[in-house]
């Protein structure tokens, strides 16, 4: 059976569109901005920030793909996470968990950071924004 070039091309385009809409999130580093000040060793901010990142990772997808939160501490940690709205909820969460695991390496324990992957973004600071 022979298929026309147009039919073959249409099948390939549909496969690419479906493949990009379903599957793993794209986690290539797009940009980062890291505060030059670092979290002090033994600082309570480290655990406060860790708790905030877990909250952002776990609640962004179920909160409309754009979620802000804070964790009381000394100092308080403020954060925001955003996902590409074309992702499934599980892919949004997976992207943010990937980023949460890499943010320390990208920004070297900075007291504030903004990191954008292709399909998700996290920002955290010691001040409200």
Swiss-Prot record:
Annotated GO biological processes are: defense response to bacterium; defense response to fungus; killing of cells of another organism
User: Which PROSITE patterns does UniProt cross-reference here?
Assistant: GNK2
Q: Which InterPro entries match?
A: Cell2Cell_Antifungal, GNK2, GNK2_sf
Q: Does the keyword Disulfide bond apply?
A: yes
Binding residues annotated for alpha-D-mannopyranose, in chain numbering: 35, 114, 125
Domain Gnk2-homologous: residue ranges:
27-129
Which keywords does UniProt give here?
Antibiotic, Antimicrobial, Disulfide bond, Fungicide, Lectin, Mannose-binding, Plant defense, Signal
Q: Which residues does UniProt assign to the signal peptide?
A: 1-23
- Name any one GO molecular function: D-mannose binding
The disulfide bridges present are: 34-107, 83-92, 95-120
According to UniProt, the name of this protein is Antifungal protein ginkbilobin-like protein
Q: Which species does this protein come from? A: Pinus pinaster (Maritime pine)
Q: What does the record give as the organism's lineage?
A: Eukaryota, Viridiplantae, Streptophyta, Embryophyta, Tracheophyta
Q: Which gene encodes it?
A: EAP
